[in-house]
Amino acid sequence: MSQIVDDAGAEAEHDAGAEAGHEPADAADQRRLGARLHALRDDRRWSLTELAEESGVSRAMINRVERGVSSPTATILGRLSGAFGLTISQLLDGSHETHAHAETEPADPDDATGVQRAATADHWTDPDTGYRRRPLSSAEFPVDVTEVRLPAGRAVTYPASAYAFLRHCIWVVDGALELVVGGVPTTLGAGDRIELGDPAKVTYRNDGETECRYVVVVARGARGRE
């Protein structure tokens, strides 16, 4: 099991703000995510302390997320999804299950054709950086395809535990992305792509003056994560 990470250098400074929590941008979605997290923990018969040890996220923060009173940052989502052996997309997609199958909602004719309308697509925004994720594939599709928008001057870091998947490819659509993998920086411009290798801590950084938009493709393995 991993130790709770909250006291190491720059990462600790970032996590200290993350652990303080943020008010949810969308209370309904936040409650669904909290319910999803609690259900996953219950399925594994984990206490709050056990999940905290597995993920490196404090018990207090996990409790706030489960109760729907705090919105986790991208870093915290990466740690939680890694603890459960899920991609971030799988963790977030699960938070919409109740919404998607609510009996009170009329059937969507696009469902039968596999069409996803941009106007009605789900998305998740990191309350700490404004980093925004939109799933481009369904939960049933054999790979995770996600569009990410990273604002200028912002950075998001995921721990190595969030990268124990089969294959992971990043393709930059607009702007420039500074990718730091295991301490090694690489700059990607529009049209560039990179495939990640062995699990390592990864920082996505936008040092430019405009938003960076990129697509992440994850092929799920036995313990696929993102």
What is each model feature region?
Residues A118-A160, R167, V217-V218:
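A short glycine-rich, His/Asp/Glu-containing loop-to-beta-strand
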Residues G182-P199:
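Short acidic-glycine-tyrosine-enriched beta hairpin
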Residues A164-G182:
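Glycine- and acidic-residue-biased ligand/ion/polar-headgroup-sensing regions
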